[in-house]
């Protein structure tokens, strides 16, 4: 029988019917009876945590605790002044953390959408949109792309360049080639490793 549901009273040792040896310090009986339940969490009167509410006491907290002056009671349900709350503007977001012009200034609701498994989903744990820098156009080269005529497209210039008469080939320029060491056994026999 399960000793937890045994009808035995508190303090009665277990009926060790199978002769199981318990290690030293193992409780051989039920624990002492638990203390009686008390509805009051603090025994006796506690001056720090007073129970109840004194009628007529203003419920507001003083805005300047050092002066001790309590603001007068107001029937308004809002205990705070109106100036405490920021006013929502009709203009776009202008935050000191979102630099205008340098980065995008969309507020962070979710990460930019990504196409995953052919389904556009939104990653909720992405970085704020203000962190992503604005894309810069690729730099344009100073010269004209090889094989093209300035001011034209590839479709316009390809046929003309391919069918145009080739000029007379230029004679090869004289190039001086340095003299290399003759092949053979090197002057060294062993190079120590570098590690």
Swiss-Prot record:
The keyword Transmembrane helix applies. Keywords: Acetylation, Cell membrane, Cell projection, Cytoplasm, Glycoprotein, Membrane, Phosphoprotein, Transmembrane, Transmembrane helix. The keyword Cytoplasm applies. It holds the Pfam family TCRP1. It is found in: Cytoplasm, Perinuclear region; Cell membrane; Cell projection, Axon. Residues 1-18, 165-195 are cytoplasmic. This is Myelin-associated neurite-outgrowth inhibitor. The lineage of its organism: Eukaryota, Metazoa, Chordata, Craniata, Vertebrata.
């Amino acid at each position: 029988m399960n000793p937890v549901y045994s009808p035995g009273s508190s303090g009665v040792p277990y009926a060790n019917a199978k002769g199981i040896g318990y290690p030293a310090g193992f409780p051989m009986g039920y624990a002492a009876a638990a203390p009686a339940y008390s509805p009051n969490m603090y025994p006796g009167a506690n001056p720090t945590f007073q129970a109840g509410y004194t009628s007529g006491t203003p419920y507001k907290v003083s805005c300047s605790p050092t002066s001790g002056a309590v603001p007068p009671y107001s029937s308004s349900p809002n205990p705070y002044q109106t100036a405490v709350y920021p006013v929502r503007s009709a203009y776009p977001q202008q935050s000191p953390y979102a630099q205008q012009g340098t980065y995008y200034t969309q507020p962070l609701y979710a990460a930019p959408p990504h196409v995953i498994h052919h389904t556009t989903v939104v990653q909720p744990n992405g970085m704020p949109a203000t962190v992503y820098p604005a894309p810069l156009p690729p730099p344009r080269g100073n010269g004209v792309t090889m094989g093209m005529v300035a001011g034209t497209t590839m479709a316009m210039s390809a046929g003309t360049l391919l069918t145009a008469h080739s000029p007379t080939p230029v004679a090869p320029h004289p190039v001086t080639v340095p003299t290399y060491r003759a092949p053979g056994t090197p002057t060294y026999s062993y190079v120590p490793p570098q590690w």
